[in-house]
């Protein structure tokens, strides 16, 4: 009996020691007089190949990423990247009835690897900056890591996870309701919050009841996006991109207009609206009997609905409904995409906003390249990004978009010139101007 008791005590002690040893290491709190370097981890389960807001954050931040980032991040001496494996292909289902099961398994897989990265593969940091969405499993795991490692949590709100999920399942689905509760419940425990628009800040205060510091950080383009004015350089760029090489000279000399639209081919971007507008534009050009400038439309990006829309494009071509309109799709490197925007005539944004308060980064990139934009404007935050008639124009229907294409791309070019000048002026607003006085100061990175 005594032996059993001693063995039990030994087993409990051994298990306790092992458990404590397995806990993530904690950040040692320095005295008020000590000035240790501020460290920040960015927790983001997104592709960093096309750097969104997270890759524009201060170069003193460490990253947890799940994809290959651009070379600028890889080469930076103050950035260390901890990669997460992508979910298995079998969890990428398009079938709605399988989605709940696949989603749960995907979250569990991400949770396992993310916890290993947050708790063991990285050192303890002063701050953990979580990009939201995705909310699951990042919010819960980041809060746990902060508790165990003496770190503090900042949530960087790009949108709401539940509003994006509602696009797939419907707003009344139990999983959407659960996600909404989860985001609201866990977000209240963060130390501070960043968000992309004033409209989003209002929602966070009124509906999420956020009481902690909440700072609006409007997106700004990275240094890769900048206007290119030299015609020889523009010609060289267009000639080097397969999708524009045959039309490069015509584009430079104004005999062809180059439209660029970046899309994720998802339900929150109604690409059929652009196709309808282009058909209307084509019909108008054909019926007028007057010479019309050809349009070369380059669509970049990958996504689940791409094949469906490509079939629609082929059908429209076969029916002769795209007279003088040539549509090509492309998957470009980050650098080529940035240069393509700088050489384009007009950008098109079909982002409709699942929440009404997020802002499309693609428009920010277009402005960074000095490219004016026409975009869907039927959501609250649109005026925070685009100054109507100065940097771009909004539309609410295919008919309106078709009219904008005719007025901006036709005539004597004065309308396009005004928008181009506005976009070039907007391109001077850069990330440091937003980050340094707000986030940089709050984090102690800028004094």
Swiss-Prot record:
Entry protein name: Chitobiosyldiphosphodolichol beta-mannosyltransferase
Localization in the cell: Endoplasmic reticulum membrane
GO BP: any one term: protein glycosylation
EC number: 2.4.1.142
Associated pathway: Protein modification; protein glycosylation
Keywords: Endoplasmic reticulum, Glycosyltransferase, Membrane, Signal-anchor, Transferase, Transmembrane, Transmembrane helix
Annotated function: Participates in the formation of the lipid-linked precursor oligosaccharide for N-glycosylation. Involved in assembling the dolichol-pyrophosphate-GlcNAc(2)-Man(5) intermediate on the cytoplasmic surface of the ER.
SUPFAM superfamilies: UDP-Glycosyltransferase/glycogen phosphorylase
Top-level EC class: transferase
Pfam families, sorted: Glyco_trans_1_4, Glyco_trans_4_4
Lumenal side of membrane: 24-447
Membrane topology note: Single-pass type II membrane protein
GO terms for cellular component: endoplasmic reticulum membrane
Catalytic activity: an N,N'-diacetylchitobiosyl-diphospho-di-trans,poly-cis-dolichol + GDP-alpha-D-mannose = a beta-D-Man-(1->4)-beta-D-GlcNAc-(1->4)-alpha-D-GlcNAc-diphospho-di-trans,poly-cis-dolichol + GDP + H(+)
Topology feature Cytoplasmic, residues: 1-2
Classification of source organism: Eukaryota, Fungi, Dikarya, Ascomycota, Pezizomycotina
GO MF term (any one): chitobiosyldiphosphodolichol beta-mannosyltransferase activity
Family indicated by similarity: Belongs to the glycosyltransferase group 1 family. Glycosyltransferase 33 subfamily.
Spans through the membrane: 3-23
